[in-house]
Curated annotation (Swiss-Prot):
Record-linked InterPro entries: Aspartic_peptidase_A1, Aspartic_peptidase_AS, BACE, BACE1, Memapsin-like, PEPTIDASE_A1, Peptidase_aspartic_dom_sf
Domain free text: DXXLL motif is required for a proper endocytosis and retrograde transport to the trans-Golgi network, as well as for regulation of lysosomal degradation.
Modified residues (N6-acetyllysine): 126, 275, 279, 285, 299-300, 307
Region (Interaction with RTN3): 479-501
Any GO molecular function: aspartic-type endopeptidase activity
Signal peptide range in chain numbering: 1-21
Family: Belongs to the peptidase A1 family.
Phenotype upon gene inactivation: Mice show a higher mortality rate early in life.
Motif (DXXLL): 496-500
Protein name: Beta-secretase 1
EC number: 3.4.23.46
The protein's assembly and partners: Monomer. Interacts (via DXXLL motif) with GGA1, GGA2 and GGA3 (via their VHS domain); the interaction highly increases when BACE1 is phosphorylated at Ser-498. Interacts with RTN1; RTN2; RTN3 and RTN4; the interaction leads to inhibition of amyloid precursor protein processing. Interacts with SNX6. Interacts with PCSK9. Interacts with NAT8 and NAT8B. Interacts with BIN1. Interacts (via extracellular domain) with ADAM10 (via extracellular domain). Interacts with SORL1; this interaction may affect binding with APP and hence reduce APP cleavage. Interacts with NRDC AND NRG1.
Amino acid sequence: MAPALHWLLLWVGSGMLPAQGTHLGIRLPLRSGLAGPPLGLRLPRETDEESEEPGRRGSFVEMVDNLRGKSGQGYYVEMTVGSPPQTLNILVDTGSSNFAVGAAPHPFLHRYYQRQLSSTYRDLRKGVYVPYTQGKWEGELGTDLVSIPHGPNVTVRANIAAITESDKFFINGSNWEGILGLAYAEIARPDDSLEPFFDSLVKQTHIPNIFSLQLCGAGFPLNQTEALASVGGSMIIGGIDHSLYTGSLWYTPIRREWYYEVIIVRVEINGQDLKMDCKEYNYDKSIVDSGTTNLRLPKKVFEAAVKSIKAASSTEKFPDGFWLGEQLVCWQAGTTPWNIFPVISLYLMGEVTNQSFRITILPQQYLRPVEDVATSQDDCYKFAVSQSSTGTVMGAVIMEGFYVVFDRARKRIGFAVSACHVHDEFRTAAVEGPFVTADMEDCGYNIPQTDESTLMTIAYVMAAICALFMLPLCLMVCQWRCLRCLRHQHDDFADDISLLK
């Protein structure tokens, strides 16, 4: 989750996962309806096949299906740490940059990293503290040998934060014991001098500076059991597996190397433009974050989007708590009326000047199944679009429709339709383009920067103001002390007189 991670992840606000709670399910009758309107027309384009690059050829069979997890609790990969190797499940998080593992007993952990048992552990004698919007962890920094059994056949020495204390970080039943931050060093804790795991991997091996994620999500199977509540996917390290997507990959530039920041230039609900200043979509940033569950939107954008989604799905009446993510809606198993819900389209800046492409998100993505309250008679869902105070976050529910390529070498992120996304017979997720969009650079939000000279000027002005306030106070104190001295002398004289009497 960013360092300002929401409850990992799936918190809405930093990057953290949402806590599992008991929700009131709202039972709604099923009504028949037509499929949503067809997607808008796009401009003609030439074939957009990605170029082959060194390290992108070859087989990644051993990495396919190497992710596991539970709906709403994140995706994890198996890793080994230390000598002899200690096996741990590690949450995959593109919204933070620390590799951190539980290193002390915790009620929600079945196992943890025991540094004293590793002959290759090196203590850096430095602490680290990471707070989230809700939750936190702290620990001790060190290095050790790390490998990924269902990944590249290499072992690297990497920085590890051994988590010794935490609050609302680990999730009961999630089955992961640590977090693998895959973002850039700029947001690493305690500072950007701490090299993230993926940087160490690329530097110490010949693996190309690229990875890709296919998050497959969870739909309701016909024969539902607790075991089937899990989700899966693939993390391909060092390249692209063409079997994991259909169609072409479309790339958007990474605006800044801290989070995986991108620029959204337009938002549509069922083909209807929200018609907002595009800066609003990116206020104060837009990031791709596998460690957050929801699609999180800035306040104004969220309100406009919900208004449009409500209007499009008006054949059913939903409680206000549903749109706030506080209540669930349930239908009889297998009868969810997907067709009454609109698609959401996000237009992303393309690599070519004045061109964008759009990713189309289905209701099967933004209505998240909640298995722990569903019965064999009901399918229950949570609205997985929420309000954000830290910009737009394209979380796991968005990524579950697409194969997402984090091409760090070329500073770009690619999107293609995932071969495993959940859809119905009427609509599928889509990645389409190009579309002509002018002045896209203006859509990025620039955080105001104050130079040192301005700060010094402000400091001098504040000091002068303080001095002006302090001067009268000092004069008053001096005057009071003088009067007190005079009064004290007078009191002594009076006492002497009384004695004489």
